[in-house]
Design a protein with these regions (language model features):
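Alpha-helical residues within the helix-turn-helix
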Residues: 31, 49, 70
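Short helix-boundary/capping micro-motifs
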Residues: 18-34
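Alpha-helical linker/hinge and terminal dimerization helices associated
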Residues: 50-51, 55, 72-87
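A detector for short, charged/polar N-terminal pre-domain segments
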Residues: 1-9, 15
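Short alpha-helical "packing" element that flanks the helix-turn-helix/winged-helix DNA-binding module
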Residues: 13-20, 72
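A short LG(V/I)-centered, amphipathic sequence patch enriched
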Residues: 48-65
Length: 87
């Protein structure tokens, strides 16, 4: 994994990642986040570049997470929840 610069990390990328992991479908994630599927794809591309991993791969009717995505997701989900609860 690449070293992330947290000063410039777009937190929306983590929101997208969390929603994609929860839904396992880009279109549903886009709907839930009130955006478009291409915007979700673009955000995933940017996050993939940051972490140096595919994170999810297309399958049948949605996406399947990579091992790294499965490892990262609980931490990302908890961090977003803590941030949401504190604001």
């Amino acid at each position: 994994m690449n070293e992330l610069n947290f000063r410039t990390l777009d937190l929306n990328l983590l929101r997208v990642f969390d929603e994609v992991m929860a839904e396992r479908n880009l279109t549903r994630a886009a709907h839930n986040l009130a955006t478009t599927q291409p915007a979700i794809s673009n955000a995933l591309r940017r996050l993939r570049e940051l972490v140096g991993d595919d994170l999810v791969r297309r399958s049948g009717y949605g996406v399947e997470p990579t091992p790294l995505a499965l490892t990262l997701w609980p931490t990302v989900r908890d961090a977003l929840r803590q941030l949401r609860d504190s604001l």
